[in-house]
Swiss-Prot record:
Predominant subcellular localization, coarse grouping: membrane
Official protein name in the record: Septation ring formation regulator EzrA
Lineage of source species: Bacteria, Bacillati, Bacillota, Bacilli, Lactobacillales
InterPro entries per UniProt: EzrA
Function: Negative regulator of FtsZ ring formation; modulates the frequency and position of FtsZ ring formation. Inhibits FtsZ ring formation at polar sites. Interacts either with FtsZ or with one of its binding partners to promote depolymerization.
Topology Extracellular: residue spans: 1-7
Native organism: Streptococcus suis (strain 05ZYH33)
Residue numbers on the Cytoplasmic membrane side: 27-574
Family: Belongs to the EzrA family.
Length: 574
């Protein structure tokens, strides 16, 4: 055979072999896909949907719940009887295509089967979800029913065991419980007949009513206790206390006490009506208002009781204190009259003593009447206490002012005695200073000293003249004494200074002799200083002139002489 023919035959054989192998591979892959689809179908078919359907079916649902269950059940029946059978047929058909090497038909069949299984899987998931929701709704209703029953029983038990705690609201509470019982019966009927969806709506309303009623019942006992027990007891206590206080002659700043009692009773009745109508927020606010009215009356009564105690306490000592202050004022008046004959007393002080006398007269009237009113009061004790307190405070204030006035009167004679002694002393000092200056053997007395001496003498004489008046003005005396004292001190200091300057000048002039013979500046200073000393009598200028010259030739010499003089200075002896 020709070579070309052989090559062609070999090529055809090889192509056929390759095509056959490729077909085997594709068929194997399709077989695997079909096996996987068969397994998916079996997994879906083996899901416990039948058991779940039977479980929900056993709940005996009706109404809307039953309609939903029938829809899910019918859907499952269609799937289990028709859809799975169709898939089984399609798988068998696809296997035939695959075995016959009709791969395109097999591929289309496999894709169709896969889509069918996806749809069935979604349908089964929705069926199971729907069945689960029906079951959960039923179980939820059952749990809520139990809770609702327990709550309802607890409400009934609370009313049954503690009827007094609810007072006049009891009939309304029983009415509300009866309405809830009717609603609950309707719910139980629907739930028992297998309609949990509609029953759930009824249960929601019933639970809302029970929760609201439970909250109301929790608040009512405390409100009822206040209007039926607390307030009446407090009101009875107030009325009893009021009667006792009236029997003991108590009066009050408020004239409408009994009408306030009546207003509180009316408020209690009105608040009871609010509680019965379940307007509890308003009732609580009204309770606070009632308590405030009661507290106000307690405060009024306690204030009068405490005022009585305080008034009695003050009244025991106040008359004696008043008598003491009155006596002091009389003594001040007598003393002022006695002293006014000798001294010119300040009109303001005399006027103030008279004002105190008048003020004490009015206080005495108030105290006397108030003390008498304690046994048989004409006004409330709080008013009496206020009057007595004010009187006591006024008396203390007057007593303090009396001390000031007494010190003023006492100071008249003391000031006169002091001024007379000082005047006598200053006259003696003037004579002593005069002798002191004369004994210094000075060339002359400086004009400054003479001026101060005569001014001081005039002030002392003016002081003595003021003291010689028939009626002495102590204010003027004290002012003159102050001037004389100041002048006397100044004159004494001036005398010391003049004598010191004169003595030091003489000493320095003598000391300068050691320098005059050879130091012309010292000689000139000596001459000027001596001239000032003997002719002008300006001893300070003379001292400064010679000391300056000596300091030039012998620094520190002046300070040495000054220290020495201060150690041996002669004091003025009065």
């Amino acid at each position: 055979m020709p070579t070309g023919t052989i090559i062609l035959i070999v090529s055809i054989v090889i192509i056929l072999i390759i095509a056959y192998v490729a077909c085997l591979i594709v068929r194997k892959r399709n077989d695997n896909l079909l096996v996987a689809l068969e397994e998916r179908k079996e997994e879906l078919f083996n899901l416990p949907v039948n058991e779940e359907v039977e479980t929900v079916k056993a709940l005996h649902l009706i109404g809307q719940s039953q309609v939903s269950f029938r829809e899910w059940n019918q859907k499952w029946v269609d799937l289990s009887l028709n859809s799975f059978a169709d898939i089984e047929n399609h798988i068998f058909e696809a296997e035939g295509y695959n075995n016959a090497f009709r791969f395109v038909s097999a591929k289309n069949a496999i894709d169709s089967i896969d889509s069918q299984i996806d749809l069935i899987e979604e349908d089964i998931a929705s069926i199971r979800q729907g069945l689960m929701e029906l079951k959960e709704q039923e179980e939820k209703n059952s749990g809520r029913v139990k809770h609702a029953l327990n709550l309802f029983d607890s409400l009934q038990e609370a009313v049954r065991e503690n009827p007094d705690s609810y007072g006049e609201t009891l009939s309304e509470l029983e009415k509300q419980l009866k309405n809830i019982e009717v609603e609950f019966s309707e719910f139980v009927m629907l739930n028992s007949s297998g309609d949990p969806i509609e029953a759930s709506e009824i249960l929601d309303k019933t639970e809302e009513h029970m929760i609201a009623l439970n909250q109301i019942m929790d608040r009512i006992p405390s409100l009822i206790e206040r209007v039926t027990k607390d307030f009446p007891e407090q009101l009875e206590d107030l009325e009893s206390g009021y009667r006792k206080l009236v029997e003991q002659n108590y009066l009050f700043t408020e004239a409408n006490i009994e009408s306030q009692f009546q207003n509180i009773r009316v408020s209690i009745r009105e608040n009871t009506a609010l509680i019965v109508s379940f307007d509890l927020d308003a009732a609580e606010a009204e309770n606070e208002g009632i308590q405030a009215k009661i507290d106000h009356l307690y405060k009024v009564f306690n204030r009068e009781i405490e005022a009585n105690k305080e008034a009695v306490k003050i009244s025991k000592n106040l008359p004696k204190f008043l008598e003491h202050v009155v006596q002091n004022t009389q003594l001040l008046d007598e003393e002022s009259q006695r002293l006014n004959a000798t001294y010119l007393l300040a009109d303001s002080k005399l006027s103030r003593i008279n004002q105190l006398k008048a003020r004490l007269e009015s206080i005495e009237i108030v105290v006397t009447e108030s003390v008498e009113d304690i046994e048989n009061p004409q006004v409330a004790y709080s008013i009496l206490e206020e009057r007595l307190d004010h009187s006591l405070a006024s008396l203390k204030e007057i007593e303090e002012e009396q001390l000031v006035l007494a010190d003023y009167l006492k100071s008249q004679e003391l000031s006169e005695n002091t001024a007379r002694k000082k005047a006598t002393l200053y006259i003696n000092k003037l004579h002593t200073l005069k002798r002191y200056m004369e004994k210094r053997n000075l060339p002359g007395i400086p004009a400054e000293f003479l001026t101060n001496f005569f001014r001081t003498s005039d002030h002392v004489e003016a002081l003595i003249a003021e003291l010689d008046y028939k009626r002495i003005n102590i204010e003027v005396v004290n002012r003159l004494l102050e001037n004389a004292t100041y002048d006397m001190n100044q004159l004494e200091e001036l005398a010391y200074l003049i004598v010191q300057n004169a003595t030091l000048t003489e000493q320095l002039l003598q000391y300068s002799n050691r320098y005059r013979s050879f130091d012309e500046s010292v000689q000139k200073a000596f001459n000027r200083s001596l001239s000032i000393f003997e002719k002008d009598f300006d001893y300070q200028a003379a001292f400064e002139e010679i000391s300056f010259a000596l300091e030039t030739v012998e620094p520190g010499v002046t300070e040495r002489f000054v220290r020495s003089y201060e150690k041996t200075r002669e004091a003025i002896r009065y």
